[in-house]
A protein has these predicted regions:
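Divalent metal-coordination and catalytic microenvironments
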Residues: 9, 14, 37, 48, ...
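General alpha-helical segment detector with a strong preference for membrane-spanning helices
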Residues: 50-54, 105, 208
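Histidine-rich, glycine-flanked metal-binding segment
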Residues: 1-41
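Metal-coordinating catalytic core of metallo-dependent amide/deamination hydrolases
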Residues: 114-213
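Short amphipathic alpha-helical segments at helix-loop
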Residues: 37, 74-78, 141-144, 175
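Alpha-helical scaffold segments that flank or form the walls of functional sites
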Residues: 57-128, 152-166
């Protein structure tokens, strides 16, 4: 990276068009805001985070992934069927993103479409940019988190259409949790939705021996 000790950042319509030690003549008449000795840096980018795991960070460091999910994460994610709980936790999560300068992120939500919309709403209100996923799971999971395949696809379609309200900063991303928790039928249906709505896909792949075996 390049550090400019005393310099200028020029933005036009929200887009940075120049960084340097002097102001180009074309922008010489524009208003200037002096930030003194403050640091001006690009926002940080987190390309993989689980927003509903905010409250169980650092727990179960002695466990492999699958036992960790069963012991800590799945019971925590089940709580997000309650939108009030989701708003409380996601509010704290989004505030921490903002406070630490993470301005762009790619996030997992939970299987609950309405709580995932709450997360997207809070990100938009905070002025943060993100891809947000409603998680899909229809096998090899606790009963309280297993979705019916067709209902999972219907909920995802409904969520994709509702996501249009959030504009250019906060966008949906198709999110099958990982192969062990998704049937071929679900994966195929999600692929069709990704193509129909022109949205990207995120998941996990081969994170540990237990998952692969």
């Amino acid at each position: 990276f390049v550090a400019i000790q005393q310099g200028y950042v020029i933005a036009v319509d929200g887009v940075v068009v120049h960084c340097g030690e002097s102001i180009p003549p074309a922008y010489g008449e524009h208003p200037i805001t002096d930030y003194g000795d403050h640091l001006i840096i690009p926002g940080f980018v987190d390309t993989h985070a689980h927003a509903p795991q905010y409250c169980n960070r650092g727990l179960g460091m002695d466990k492999e992934l699958l036992p960790w999910l069963e012991t800590y994460t799945f019971p925590e994610e089940a709580k997000f069927s309650d939108q009030e709980y989701a708003r409380l936790v996601y509010g704290a999560f989004v505030h921490d993103l903002w406070r630490n300068g993470t301005t762009r992120s790619i996030l997992f939500g939970t299987i609950h479409k309405d709580s995932t919309l709450v997360l997207m709403e809070l990100l938009q209100k905070a002025g943060l940019s993100a891809y947000v996923g409603k998680v899909n799971m229809d096998r090899n999971s606790p009963e309280f988190l297993i979705e019916d395949t067709q209902q999972s696809l219907a909920d995802t379609k409904e969520w994709l259409e509702a996501s249009a309200q959030f504009g250019p900063l906060v966008k949906p991303i198709i999110t099958p949790r990982f192969v062990p928790s998704c049937t071929s039928e679900l994966m195929s249906g999600l692929g069709n939705l990704a193509e129909a709505y022109n949205v990207p896909v995120q998941s996990h792949l081969s994170e540990n021996h237990g998952e692969i075996e």
